[in-house]
């Protein structure tokens, strides 16, 4: 069982394969050249226990054995991987996506992203669909390591920015075929921009940029969004969809969605 996830912006199209971990044995043969996978890895301790019980090896070992890891594969969470699994990720140059708020919500712990970054691994910042407000994800990424380790010195703001800005841009550049031009204002880069209405109360410079964002920015400051040169939001008004109509339709259909959900839960017992 496998689903094909199409990511598209105008003529930018790439595919990553998302699949259930139990179907690993057929994945290597199914993977076309130049494509990668997206999979959750060791989000909870139970994932590792289940893998050891059923297959006699840890989750990361199984992915490594079946050729799933690689420089075009994204592994989300990686909270409970051990040293050997970490070495597999590093050896294969696999992407790691840190999901702080999702991990907090599910009370599963936190990935050791500081040591991964120090070791030169490709750690990005995601949100597991929690919300689409990535600046709040910056904040939680900054705070979570301090709480987990009970040490206010943990998780430097520059490390948060490295994950969220530089590494995310590198991953997007690879996925959409723009290389190191993604996330930059340079010739031939994609025209993807947001305008932020931010009025700093103190000096705003490279020495405090991560903390200005972490403590001072919010999604409500975004006034305009441009994707591939096209305004998707202008002066805080969406240009391509009728927001009121979408909201009204959502209110209309959500009771049916919930009814199907409860019907499924009742069948599963």
Predicted features along the sequence, with ranges:
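Short, acidic/turn-prone active-site loops that include or flank metal/cofactor-
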Residues: 43, 100-105, 128-130
């Amino acid at each position: 069982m496998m689903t094909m996830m199409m990511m598209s912006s105008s003529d930018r199209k790439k595919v990553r394969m998302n699949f259930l971990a139990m179907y690993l044995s057929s994945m290597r043969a199914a993977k076309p050249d130049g494509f990668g996978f997206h999979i959750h890895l060791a989000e909870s301790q139970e994932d590792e226990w289940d893998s050891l019980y059923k297959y006699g090896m840890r989750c990361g070992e199984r992915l490594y054995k079946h050729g799933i890891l690689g420089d075009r594969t994204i592994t989300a969470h990686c909270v409970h991987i051990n040293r050997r699994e970490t070495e597999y990720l590093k050896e294969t140059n696999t992407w790691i996506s840190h999901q702080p708020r999702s991990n907090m919500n599910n009370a599963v712990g936190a990935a050791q992203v500081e040591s991964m970054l120090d070791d030169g691994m490709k750690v990005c910042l995601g949100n597991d669909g929690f919300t689409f407000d990535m600046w709040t994800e910056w904040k939680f990424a900054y705070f979570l390591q301090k709480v987990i380790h009970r040490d206010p010195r943990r998780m430097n703001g520059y490390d948060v920015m490295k994950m969220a800005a530089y590494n995310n841009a590198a991953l997007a550049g690879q996925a959409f075929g723009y290389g190191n031009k993604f996330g930059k204002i340079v010739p031939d880069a994609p025209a993807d921009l947001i305008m932020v209405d931010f009025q700093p109360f103190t000096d705003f410079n490279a020495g405090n940029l991560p903390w200005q964002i972490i403590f001072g920015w919010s999604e409500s400051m975004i006034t305009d969004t441009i994707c591939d040169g096209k305004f998707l939001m202008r002066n805080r008004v969406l240009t391509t969809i009728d927001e009121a109509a979408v909201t009204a339709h959502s209110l209309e259909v959500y009771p049916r969605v919930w009814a199907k959900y409860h019907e499924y839960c009742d069948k599963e017992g």
